[in-house]
Amino acid sequence: MAAFSQYPLSTGWSFKDSDDQSPEAWMPVPVVPSVAHQDLQANQKLKNPYIGFNELDARWVNDKSWTYRTVFQKPAVAAGSSIILAFDGLDTFATVKLDGSVILQSDNMFLAHRVDVTKALEAEGDHVLEIDFDCAMRRARELREKDTKHNWASFNGDPARMAVRKAQYHWGWDWGPLLSTAGIWREVRLEVYSAKISDLWTEVELASDHQTARVSAFTEVDAADSVDSYKASFLLSLHGKEVAREVATLKDKVAKVTFDVTQPSLWWPNGYGDPALYEISVSLEKEDCEIHSVSKKIGIRTAELIQQPDRHGKSFFFRINGVDVFCGGSCWIPADNLLPSITAERYRKWIELMVAGRQVMIRVWGGGCYEDDSFYQACDELGVLVWQDFMFGCGNYPTWPELLESIEKEANYNVRRLRHHPSIVVYVGNNEDYQVQESAGLVYDYEDKNPENWLKTDFPARYIYEKLLPSVVEKLSPKTVYHPGSPWGDGKITSDPTVGDMHQWNVWHGTQEKYQIFDTLGGRFNSEFGMEAFPHMSTIEYFVENEADKYPQSHVLDFHNKADGHERRIATYLVENLRTATDLETYVYLTQVVQAETMMFGYRGWRRQWGDERHCGGALLWQLNDCWPTISWAIVDYFLRPKPAFYAVARVLKPIAVGVRREHHDWSVTHAQPPKTSKYELWIASSLQKETVGTIELRFLSVNTGLDVRAPILRDNVKIVPNGTTNILEGVINHKAQPEPHVLAARLWVDGEVTARDVDWPQPFKYLDLSDRGLEVNKVSESGNEQKLLITAKKPVKCLVFEERDGIRVSDSAMDIVPGDGQTVTVTGLKAGDAPLKYKYLGQ
């Protein structure tokens, strides 16, 4: 009995323009997985589309069909074994031919395919595998033209994209280029076996006291013949040590065992405990010979989405292992427009950055793709909760029968693939499709509960989100929460702040409110909000080739910002808040200050609301990352270089954070006058699970002199409420008695150490003289590749930002420094002889 074997088909490929019939048309493919844009670049047929205006020069690629071909020899096959040709992903309209015969046709990028080629490979010698990838943009237009009755309402990209099960951002989005890829985007291989494990999954029940857990493990076997003589040997282990072992027989090609685990190690999100991962493995055996084995990492945990009526409306927050978790985090878009170029190492670096930024949840956005296994593995290992959208975004999707069938297969395949990951705590039906329904005035009668009726309306996609997808999740991953859409709340208008989740875009988009009042604009769970900022100069220098173009309003910089009204909106927030500048380096910095302040005001206020009976259950900023070097809402750019907002968010999400703010005074309205008085508030937010005692100080420091304008306030033995908010004090600033502009500087000590700071500034910054700050940055120690810098100032300093240099990490940046409160920053990665990091602050 031969064991399972596999043979990757990753090399030896060539490709060509499908319309070019000349023998010289074939070009070598360095490695598969790949897409045509990558392979054209490798053959010097296409310039890097991420530089300058090269995206425009790459548009011709979108309109072409491409053919890939390889020649291989039949592997050794034992008697009774089958040969399977396995494709993990084909992008998108693919016709697969083996030795000239069509063996597969696919029109869904998100599906894997398995084709039995045993008979086709009976002949010895060379075999030719050829894949024709038809032009997805053309096919999309043809499909749209066939369905004239459907209302193709959408935001972003060509509405025809909704006819195709392909990453929707490939049609261009308001943060990315229009690069429609084609190719073998995931692994292809030959598998040879008489029997193999086709699936391994678990169902976990954790006792309410967390003292015991029951792990039921299941395996499914793929075999041409009877499996009565096979057995499945299961092993559960933790950190390489055996926890339990059991052997089971197969019935209808499925085996099941149940393990009772005492004192289980639980999987926790980062900041709440160790994300303990058990390993479940199964070996398929016959006559004491191992035929095939599979193992997966799983977590023992519970995850609930708490939606209960309360005085604010209806709650929306996550409870993990019985602990309420404020989900501060980010939305995730694909990390590249050319998906096969993203390595497992790059995925892990992104998730490591999230954890370094104290973020606990990532939302996989519905216009991209179901991510690579390595993405979810990193989230499992590092304790990051995953909000997983299904791949529908910003549109009214059609529902003809063939498309629904393909969507159901897609959902089944991906939920099966992902269901063992403890990081995934919610599946969500779509991104903003209910907002499209509202915008276009499509029919949505929430009280009509008959799915067949929904298909007859002009919003038939409701059937996908409220019938098809939840049925798949219930069948395959019954303990994972399903939510129909983002945003969505009980069928109410999606901007309703009392229920469900909310995308709050009235800062930047919409009514373009002042970012200083962001916290008043939120809902029960703020799953999108953002502010644009330029990336660092090193990133700009990558995609802006000509020195003459390195100014804020250059055509190439404009071209690399795809957002609607981008320049005008950036300018609005700049001129309202800061003294403007025209040199590029300062302009870049100023946009980053605005983004950092916006994120701080939002997160700080919403985290405070967590303590008000879970008024706000979480905040997921738009967006963590970029898919190309660009100007966008990302807080970390394409090259993993954090913008100042990354650090601002990290400080607000500390286990214990202090907040201080004065009431907002709108200086931009007609006949605005300086306020005579301003109320202020001081509070502490804690995610710790036990009460803590600390000392808190509030100082009132002149912006102009750095001196106290009134006596500090000091409170000892302050009891800090666990997993909530502790309101410390309220007061009033009398601007007649204290006319000098001054900051409110708060410090919190716990166990004798400063654990948190916050500084509230008079707004807007443009009215302040921030020159001559007396700032000093001194190296106080050095050990190996680690340096410690002490930062002091004679007058309050706003947003001290360190240079982001590849391979170098700073423990903090975008900092406010006040007199009498020196702060230490650790720099990791600088070698002896390296130039010190440059820095910039407001008013410098």
UniProtKB/Swiss-Prot annotation:
Glycans are attached at N723. Keywords: Carbohydrate metabolism, Glycoprotein, Glycosidase, Hydrolase, Polysaccharide degradation. The active site is at E432. Pfam families: Glyco_hydro_2 (PF00703), Glyco_hydro_2_N2 (PF22666), Mannosidase_ig (PF17786). The keyword Hydrolase applies. One of its GO terms (biological process) is glycoprotein catabolic process. Its EC number is 3.2.1.25. InterPro entries: Beta-gal/glucu_dom_sf, Beta-mannosidase-like_N2, Beta-mannosidase_GH2, Galactose-bd-like_sf, Glyco_hydro_2_Ig-like, Glycoside_hydrolase_SF, Ig-like_fold, Mannosidase_ig. Pathway: Glycan metabolism; N-glycan degradation. One of its GO terms (molecular function) is beta-mannosidase activity. The keyword DNA-binding does not apply. SUPFAM superfamilies: (Trans)glycosidases, beta-Galactosidase/glucuronidase domain, Galactose-binding domain-like. It is an enzyme of class 3 (hydrolase). Gene3D superfamilies: Galactose-binding domain-like, Glycosidases, Immunoglobulins. Belongs to the glycosyl hydrolase 2 family. Beta-mannosidase B subfamily. In contrast to clade A beta-mannosidases, which are likely secreted, clade B proteins appear to be intracellular. Exoglycosidase that cleaves the single beta-linked mannose residue from the non-reducing end of beta-mannosidic oligosaccharides of various complexity and length. Prefers mannobiose over mannotriose and has no activity against polymeric mannan. Is also severely restricted by galactosyl substitutions at the +1 subsite. PANTHER family: BETA-MANNOSIDASE. This is Beta-mannosidase B. It comes from Aspergillus flavus (strain ATCC 200026 / FGSC A1120 / IAM 13836 / NRRL 3357 / JCM 12722 / SRRC 167). The gene is mndB.
